[in-house]
Amino acid sequence: MKLTKTIGKEILLGSWFLGGGGGGLPEGGEAVLEQVLQTGEVVFRDVAELADDEVIVTASLVGSPASTTSCIKDVHYRQVYDWFCLNNQKPLSAVVTNEPGGHSVTNGWMLSAITGLPMLDAACNGRAHPTGVMGAMGLNAIPDYRSLQTAAGGDGPREIGITATGTVDGTSQMVRMAAVQAGGYVTVLRNPVTAAYFRENASVGVVSQARMIGQHWQQSMGDLPTLLQTLKALLNCTLLGEGRIRAIDLQMSGGFDVGTFTLETA
């Protein structure tokens, strides 16, 4: 599957739903999509096409999606890729986004457009998650697994780049600290795994699923009851409640978006 503007928007809408409240808004994803299409070509491959020993790397954006002081430049995508290749023992065959989300599903797209490395029709996790450990595909439970993470971001005096190796939790904490220093978030490559491990532990096919949801979403635009019925049929969902959001509280703390909302139901 080759990324186009139409396909990209379908993926963004579906990923916004699958993100489950995390992963940013489609507006942010659309800005990335436009930039990616102007930069190069992005092709999605099925992980089944890879040999068991080929290496997959995760692309992520770590930090606060609500930040207004963050800055990710094209050079940062190239830097994290070069640093990762310099420190990883095997060549990379594909890149995968860490999670669905209106913005986060685009993680890896710019890197793919710049380097030609294919994206996979998959994600580490089937929904958005706030910590690196949650999106580590169980690697944190493997005693001898050594995580490799490279991160870059920020502008002017806030610009920062790091390479970290160690446990999944330890390196993830280092990246989170870098996101705070960068003013909100950093672009990250992390946790190389074989295709064999990935097939058994990742959310394979979720990009195609997101696209399908996005197509139905567009067809039902403005007709909420029809959209809800379609989503329930597609995903075997249960509607827990419906009503107006009466209050929202959103704060940025330690590189996280932390918030609550109040839903008034009948």
What are these regions (language model features)?
Residues 2-15, 27-266:
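Non-transmembrane, aqueous-exposed alpha-helical and coiled segments at domain scale
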